[in-house]
Amino acid sequence: MTAPKCVTTTTYLVKTKEQPWWPDNAIRRWWISVAIVIFIGVCLVALMYFTQQQARNGSGSG
């Protein structure tokens, strides 16, 4: 039985972690900052959606 693709990719990254498979530290830093910005944006959108749902449910018929 073959392992899932994500598992093989993770093991590949772990095996090649000793080698500098990132071209530059700046690129890694840029990707980390992009991931953080996307994560914060998703959290804000989810929070806004949740508050709107709560307000709509609380107001009832209006």
From Swiss-Prot:
Keywords: Host membrane, Membrane, Transmembrane, Transmembrane helix
GO CC annotations on file: host cell membrane; membrane
Residues passing through the membrane, by range: 30-50
Membrane topology label: Single-pass membrane protein
Keyword Transmembrane: yes
Record's keyword annotation contains Membrane: yes
Compartment(s) of residence: Host membrane
Name of protein: Protein UL148D
Gene, per the UniProt record: UL148D
